[in-house]
Swiss-Prot record:
GO terms for molecular function: chloride transmembrane transporter activity; monoatomic ion channel activity. Keywords: Cell membrane, Ion channel, Ion transport, Membrane, Transmembrane, Transmembrane helix, Transport. It is a multi-pass membrane protein. It comes from the Bacteria. The chain crosses the membrane at residues 10-30, 54-74, 99-119, 120-140, 149-169, 186-206, 223-243, 258-278, 300-320, 322-342, 343-363, 371-391. This is Putative ion-transport protein YfeO. Belongs to the chloride channel (TC 2.A.49) family. One of its GO terms (cellular component) is plasma membrane.
Length: 418
């Protein structure tokens, strides 16, 4: 016979697995549609028209039209494509299901059109809303928070292809009774995360790791170097934190979302022309291209880091539906490669991983997620103790500092209301 604690844990196991699988399938379908549309917009269509896909005209035109298209969706869809992600944390309150079709369309258009945002926030919003709406109907005795946690865990597992990230994140956020062991509370979320990760793995494998030279033995000077790199990344990130609410307020002076996002798309196009196609899109595939390109110099990496960070701020401030974590990782990689090129004595494994740790910490203010992203992009067990030590001064630097999020105005513009 199972102990009552075990029966309690098993109670949500089946819903957790179902939510994890569904979370992954929604992500896969959205990413597949976005990939097909991206191929049409950036390969087939310019080839048919006899235009180079990396020509300034095409980059500016596609991003401007993408902004206009997303603006039309936000303006006219029911629920106005959900809340503005710039005003929301990664895991937020459930939105009405009526807003989800518009949100999914806006996300697909942004991903395919080259906007410098990732899928994580909208996918999280969609999965939470569906889990709460369906779960409340099927099992009304389970509260909304439980469904939110399961959907969040399933989505995190699906996004990163492993339940480890969910375990790390929820180990610090599940504040239950002290009489209930932590792993009892983690059981169902980890089931959801594992189901999401395994389902994603059946269709594709998220490829985060970079081919960076292996890091051997840790030395004391490496800790100092890593702390300096993380501090530089934090400084760069805090500039973006300062800019985001100000640019957001400026952009939202334009009351028409079609015009506002059209202007935002045009600015993104200009930034894309300056730094090239590798600075477009969510950043994961592009950072692989950046590392593989041996022709990039210190100034090239610096330009890519600055432009990608600027594009992230512009996209978020303009109201595009997307997340900030994936493009932030790209910024960290570019910054780390730049610092390694500038000071070759510091191994690239240290500069890249510590830069990712610093910039993701600014964006998420989540120590475990920052450590996880740094560790999966530069997978080297020798780095783990160094990253844990470097996290300490980085966390001190950010204590009490504002987050990369816009305070929600008392009365949002009509197109952002749900």
């Amino acid at each position: 016979m199972l102990h009552p604690r075990a029966r309690t844990m098993l109670l949500l196991s089946l819903p957790a697995v179902a939510i994890g699988i569904a979370s992954s399938l929604i992500l896969i379908v959205v990413m597949k549609i976005a990939s097909v549309l991206q191929n049409l917009l950036w390969l087939r269509l310019p080839g048919t028209l006899g235009i180079a896909q990396d020509s300034p005209f095409w980059i500016i035109a596609i991003l401007t039209l993408t902004g206009i298209a997303v603006g039309l969706v936000i303006r006219f869809s029911q629920g106005h494509a959900g809340p503005d992600p710039a005003c929301e944390p990664l895991i937020g309150a459930p939105v009405p299901p009526s807003a989800l079709p518009g949100l999914i369309v806006a996300l697909i258009l942004g991903l395919a059109g080259g906007v410098s945002l990732g899928p994580e926030h909208p996918i999280m919003t969609v999965n939470i809303a569906l889990a709460v709406a369906i779960g409340a109907r099927l099992l009304p005795r389970v509260n909304r928070m439980e469904w939110t946690i399961l959907a969040s865990a399933g989505t995190i597992g699906a996004l990163f292809g492993t339940p480890v990230a969910a375990a790390l994140i929820f180990s610090q956020t599940l504040n239950g009774s002290s009489e209930v062991p932590l792993w009892d509370r983690l059981f169902a979320p980890l089931m959801a995360a594992a189901a999401g990760a395994l389902t994603t793995g059946l269709f594709f494998h998220p490829h985060f790791s970079l081919p960076i030279a292996h890091y051997g033995q840790m030395e004391m000077t490496d800790i100092l170097s890593g702390a300096i790199v993380a501090a530089i990344a934090i400084a760069a990130g805090m500039i973006a934190v300062w800019c985001l609410p100000r640019l957001h307020a400026m952009m939202h002076q334009i009351k028409n979302p079609v015009l506002m996002l059209g202007v935002g798309g045009f600015i993104l196009g200009i930034l894309g022309v300056i730094a090239g196609p590798v600075s477009l899109f969510k950043g994961l595939d592009e950072m692989q291209q950046m590392v593989a390109n041996q022709a990039f110099s210190t100034s090239d990496y610096f330009l890519l880091a600055v432009i990608k960070l600027a594009a992230l701020v512009v996209a978020a401030a303009s109201g595009f539906r997307g997340g900030r974590i994936f493009p932030a990782v790209f910024v960290g990689v570019a910054l780390g490669l730049m610092l390694h090129e500038h000071v070759p004595a510091v191994p690239a494994a240290i500069t890249v991983s510590c830069a990712i740790l610093g910039i993701v910490l600014v964006v998420t203010r989540d120590g475990w997620l920052s450590l996880f992203m740094a560790a999966v992009v530069v997978p080297n067990t020798t780095l783990l103790p160094l990253l844990c030590i470097v996290m300490l001064p980085a966390w001190l630097l950010l204590a009490g500092k504002p987050m990369m999020m816009v305070n929600r105005p008392k009365q949002q513009p009509p197109h952002d209301n749900v």
